[in-house]
Amino acid sequence: MEYRTIRDILTNAEKCFGNEDAIRYKIGKNEIAAKTYTQLKEDSERITALLKKLGEPKSHIALIGATSYLWIASYFGIVDGGNVAVPLDVSLPAEELCELIDRADVTILIVDEIRKDVIEAAKEKCPKLKYILSMQKEANEGNILSLTKSMMEQTIDEDTGVEKTEITPDQLCTIMFTSGTTGKSKGVMLTHRNLVENATCLDMKLPERNVILSVLPIHHAYCLSMDILKGISLGAIICINDSLMRVAKNIKLFKPNMILMVPLMIETFAKKLEDVKDLPEKVVKEAVFGSQFHTICSGGAYLNPEYIELFERFGIQILQGYGMTECSPVISTTVAWNVKKNSVGQLLPNCEAKTVDGELWVRGSSVMQGYYKMPEETKTALKDGWLCTGDLGYVDEERFIYLTGRKKNLIITKNGENVSPEELENKLSSSRLVQEVLVREAKGVIEAEIYPDEEYAKKQGLEREEEVRVELQKLIDEYNQGAPAYKKI
């Protein structure tokens, strides 16, 4: 099946799997609820109809929330109606989220009630914002609309215009923010073609009704493209993990066949396998993952090949990939029948690569349009259609990619998050007590080496080194309080 737009993916899936489960999620501790492909399509169409009443065509609409059925339905509702989705990290401080909302020219915000602080801050700090839709509210409260109530008031028929709205493959549909080496997040502009071809151009020979447990943050391109878009294109059952603290329990509850993970999670599960390694190999796999489990897809950061061999012993294949948000995001991946040691996989069919002065450049239909309202950064990243990845590496004659290092100054944590050292250094340097600061990664954690302004310290009555150290620790503690977990020092 050839898809031109994201709408085609859901439309075809609903035709093929209408009354079959599309999304499963927990209610209460151990009860599973489900929504079918028909329900998902109808709810997304209601959201499209609602957004059409509220905004202008091609409106920029932000999504802030953990993975949920309503988040997924909202995403399809936004892009299938010709609008632009702006998925944002639910864990960011309210001030930073408001800045991104404003920079992305967002006029409608769909938000989870767990971020009430963002709702209040956005009303004051985001002048372009016209409507706020709450995912949990059951009734409208002032200018905060209930998403559920408002969408259920919409009728779906031939006159709603949902299917009539013309969208083209090269139309902008999603802006995803990623950390940059300058310290300022960049809005990666992705089209329908970018995301659709990235998700569907490679036949990984996965069965149609795979059960996938979605554990990664949904605002990440990796989760959105591979869990959601690829999963739905294959008629998969997507099960929503409600907490990283409960992944092991949710594996037993949902009984998935496969999971997308980052290396940090794989390392955690490797320890669980080691804990029961004295049992027969088949029993080990069943104890940790269940007998039905067969595949882990790894991405976001480097994975030690030893883990691939360890999991293989217990009948679990790890398919390792390489990518970046600017490439929608997958550039290369291993597949069960085509693996080369020390490679991060073979280029996707829609992608080509070359090496320029040791740096890997890629080109293809998954490469972004550019960075939103950042022409200079776009010019630096894109050279005649080639994306400069910032990674050192090469491609062999069989199109396998090998990475040898990094060119750009960016920390990639084990959970796949990109952290700009300059961003953290700028925040700490705002204190008069800090003369110089160097942020770096060491043994999997972020650390800061701070040189105090001794003259200023003395003026503040901080005579002893220990007193200065205490004040600097207070500064770091204060920063950590407002920082998402992956940016903590």
Question: Residues of each region from the PLM?
Answer:
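Conserved structural elements of the adenylate-forming
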Residues: K41-R46, P169, V188-E208, V215
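Conserved pre-ATP/AMP-binding loop-to-beta segment of ANL
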Residues: G18-D21, S134, Q154-F177, K184, ...
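Structural core segment of the AMP-binding/adenylate-forming
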Residues: D80-S150, G444
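Conserved ATP-binding/catalytic segment of the ANL
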Residues: L347, K354, E359-T413, N418, ...
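Conserved AMP-binding/adenylation subdomain of ANL enzymes
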Residues: V196-V211, I218-V283
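Gly/Ser/Thr-rich phosphate-binding loop
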Residues: N257-M261, F269-V339, Q435
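Conserved AMP-binding/adenylate-forming core of the ANL superfamily
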Residues: I23-G55, S59-S68, I72-F76, P93-C98, ...
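Conserved AMP-binding A3 loop
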Residues: A34-T38, C173-A199
